[in-house]
């Protein structure tokens, strides 16, 4: 694994906009950055793939343990939703995807930082944009037959939708916030993969989702019942909404399912360590401060907010601001990220269904990744 500095394509903005990637620049700063890329060999990709598959399986086992031992209160979930979440698990409601954030420099085992199991983003750039980047280089002769990419995301998403269609998911609603360009872009892409699988799709802004108490179902902006709904909107936010009580009686089936909120909550890090202590892919995690350098993470913090890195001297080496400062926290052993003269890198390893099938890499000058950290493509040397 190494970071390579190069030159962006002369017309890269037009290239990415042509394929629908409009949010390549955020607040006048580059988000998509092809002035550099990461290079791997196949052995390293196999390490990432195996780690991801093992971690996902352990997370599923951990969720089952939480349900069986009735530990949902550890996750800060209001008690009125506990039985409903258990029902979601027992009904084996399907999951589409998730993204593990891993710390790795190409040596030793990758270490799990967290699992973005509910509302993972950076999907379109991982699936389509970086693949288009690699193909365009190969078409110019710069890398003909020399490089590959860990990326079957597009194909696996279509296959996952085909499976859901076989289970009766003929029409699926998609919801996100119209005011968030990245979320809208990711949902638009997911709609396209569902359409390619033969599913009828309909988009609705999350604020326009209503509830029909007579039919006991959520409804769209045309008052049509929503049987299946993919929402790029966090479960923890939904449980705070005025309509949350209707979740308990609604016939609507959600994607991601309610049980997935257990895996996206950082409490799962401590549960994993309890179940699999000393596992090579895990970092020690606890509900109480631990010895040595550690990272303090609010259990529902998002986009790197309110994260604190604490050294052995118990002084904050780095901390970020945000709205989650008053939440319960998990303490996770600190593990260094890949570092180059350009900054720190986090590997985002994707799961579709229960299979690892792609990767995206975020880079930042700080050791805590946030929502505007740069996305760099990767390639595999054949």
Model-predicted segments: where are they?
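Preference for protein termini
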Residues: 1-382
């Amino acid at each position: 694994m190494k970071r390579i500095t190069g030159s962006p394509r002369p017309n890269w903005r037009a290239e990415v906009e042509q394929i629908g990637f409009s949010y390549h620049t955020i607040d006048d700063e580059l988000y998509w950055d092809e002035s550099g890329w990461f290079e791997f060999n196949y052995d390293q990709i196999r390490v990432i793939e195996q780690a991801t598959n093992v971690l996902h399986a352990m997370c599923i086992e951990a969720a089952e343990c939480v349900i069986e031992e009735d530990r949902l209160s550890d996750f800060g979930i209001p008690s009125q939703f506990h039985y409903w979440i258990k029902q979601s698990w027992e009904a084996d409601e399907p999951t589409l995807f998730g993204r593990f954030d891993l710390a790795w420099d190409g040596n030793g085992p990758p270490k799990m930082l967290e699992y973005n199991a509910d509302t993972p983003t950076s999907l379109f750039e991982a699936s389509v944009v970086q693949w288009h980047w690699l193909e365009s280089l190969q078409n110019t002769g710069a890398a003909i037959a020399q490089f590959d990419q860990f990326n079957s995301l597009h194909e696996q998403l279509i296959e996952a939708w085909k499976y859901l269609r076989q289970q009766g998911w003929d029409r699926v609603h998609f919801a996100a916030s119209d005011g968030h360009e990245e979320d809208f872009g990711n949902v638009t892409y997911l709609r396209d993969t569902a359409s390619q699988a033969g599913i009828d799709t309909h988009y609705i802004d999350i604020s326009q989702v209503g509830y029909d108490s007579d039919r006991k179902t959520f409804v769209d902006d045309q008052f049509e019942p929503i049987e299946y709904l993919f929402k790029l909107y966090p479960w923890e936010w939904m449980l705070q909404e005025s309509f949350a009580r209707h979740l308990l009686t609604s016939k609507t089936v959600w994607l991601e399912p309610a049980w997935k909120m257990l895996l996206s909550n950082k409490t799962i890090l401590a549960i994993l360590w309890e179940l699999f202590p000393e596992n090579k892919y895990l970092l020690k995690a606890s509900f109480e401060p631990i010895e040595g350098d550690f990272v303090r993470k609010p259990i529902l913090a998002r986009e790197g907010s309110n994260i604190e890195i604490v050294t052995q001297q118990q002084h904050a080496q780095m901390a970020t601001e945000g709205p989650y400062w008053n939440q319960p926290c998990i303490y996770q052993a600190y593990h260094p990220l890949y570092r180059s003269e350009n900054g720190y890198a986090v590997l985002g390893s994707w799961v579709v269904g229960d299979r690892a099938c792609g990767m995206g890499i975020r880079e930042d000058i700080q050791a805590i990744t946030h929502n505007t950290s740069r996305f760099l493509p990767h390639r595999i040397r054949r």
